[in-house]
Amino acid sequence: MTIAVGRAPERGWFDVLDDWLKRDRFVFVGWSGLLLFPCAYLALGGWLTGTTFVTSWYTHGLASSYLEGCNFLTVAVSSPANAFGHSLLFLWGPEAQGDFTRWCQIGGLWTFTALHGAFGLIGFMLRQFEIARLVGIRPYNAIAFSAPIAVFVSVFLMYPLGQSSWFFGPSFGVAGIFRFILFLQGFHNWTLNPFHMMGVAGVLGGALLCAIHGATVENTLFEDGEQANTFRAFEPTQAEETYSMVTANRFWSQIFGIAFSNKRWLHFFMLFVPVTGLWMSAIGIVGLALNLRAYDFVSQELRAAEDPEFETFYTKNILLNEGLRAWMAPQDQPHQNFVFPEEVLPRGNAL
């Protein structure tokens, strides 16, 4: 008998850290967690701090915190003033000079929340990649999650980067987002943009597909147990199918004359529709950042200007956009000292 005596190879700090990060625990950490957890914690903490205590008086001339009397729908972490351009507004930078109160007043929490939020979302996508690799499945969850990341980055970062300052990015709040949507409509005619149309089709189409799929599966469950309801009859480890694809195919073939017969194509289509829609809308927002025009039906505008009896829904919407610009510009750009007399404000032909 031969006995071999040797020393186990020494493990470096990287291997030790890798084992610790990937240890099986209730909440998986992983390498992605080094980015996800700190950034998500700081972004959420910055938003809660701003909405609770910090005013927007110095940046937008508004009250925006619970402390000032706002509610959940009207609080916001507001974007910095236009004068700061695209400065990252570091706490130690020349704007705040280490003064935390001043940093909050000038909008430092917005850049803090936006950047940590973006990296937190990217960390969550990397988390899905990492766990998919460890479990041994394909990474389509992470690929799908790239769509909301693209929308967030395009709206909160790319759009204001294309404009004159962070000021034109949306504030982090419900009413603040609504104001931003109205701004996009008034200054970019966003609802008539084909990329917006594709985004709406993707989101609503995805919701429709989700509802149809869920209802169809519920409709075709096998009666495979004596329990009080169909949910208790399911076992996570059962080998057989829990619903009938053949029956579902027959049903929709009768409804539309055509139906999915391949589960893999069906679920890929459910993935493709909303993800593509969100990506298209993100591309459209980047176009708005560059002030690209979409559809302008100039012939209708010229005819409406010449003929008092000719007006279309398009020309009325153009007038609404002019009204939005006239009312929002003095508020958003007070340093320009805009003054619009009543006679230049838009009025439809019918008025």
From Swiss-Prot:
A Pfam family this chain is assigned to: Photo_RC
Annotated positions binding chlorophyll a ChlzD2: 116
Residues at which a plastoquinone binds: 213, 260
Location(s), subcellular: Cellular thylakoid membrane
Subunit structure of this chain's protein: PSII is composed of 1 copy each of membrane proteins PsbA, PsbB, PsbC, PsbD, PsbE, PsbF, PsbH, PsbI, PsbJ, PsbK, PsbL, PsbM, PsbT, PsbX, PsbY, PsbZ, Psb30/Ycf12, peripheral proteins PsbO, CyanoQ (PsbQ), PsbU, PsbV and a large number of cofactors. It forms dimeric complexes.
Family, as annotated: Belongs to the reaction center PufL/M/PsbA/D family.
Residues that bind pheophytin a: 128, 141
Coiled coil start-end: none
Function: Photosystem II (PSII) is a light-driven water:plastoquinone oxidoreductase that uses light energy to abstract electrons from H(2)O, generating O(2) and a proton gradient subsequently used for ATP formation. It consists of a core antenna complex that captures photons, and an electron transfer chain that converts photonic excitation into a charge separation. The D1/D2 (PsbA/PsbD) reaction center heterodimer binds P680, the primary electron donor of PSII as well as several subsequent electron acceptors. D2 is needed for assembly of a stable PSII complex.
Lineage, opening ranks: Bacteria, Bacillati, Cyanobacteriota, Cyanophyceae, Oscillatoriophycideae
GO biological process, one term: photosynthetic electron transport in photosystem II
Residue sites binding Fe cation per the record: 213, 267
Name of the protein in its database record: Photosystem II D2 protein
PROSITE patterns per record: REACTION_CENTER
GO cellular component: photosystem II; plasma membrane-derived thylakoid membrane
Reaction it catalyzes: 2 a plastoquinone + 4 hnu + 2 H2O = 2 a plastoquinol + O2
Binding-site list for chlorophyll a PD2: 196
Domain of life: Bacteria
UniProt organism field: Crocosphaera subtropica (strain ATCC 51142 / BH68)
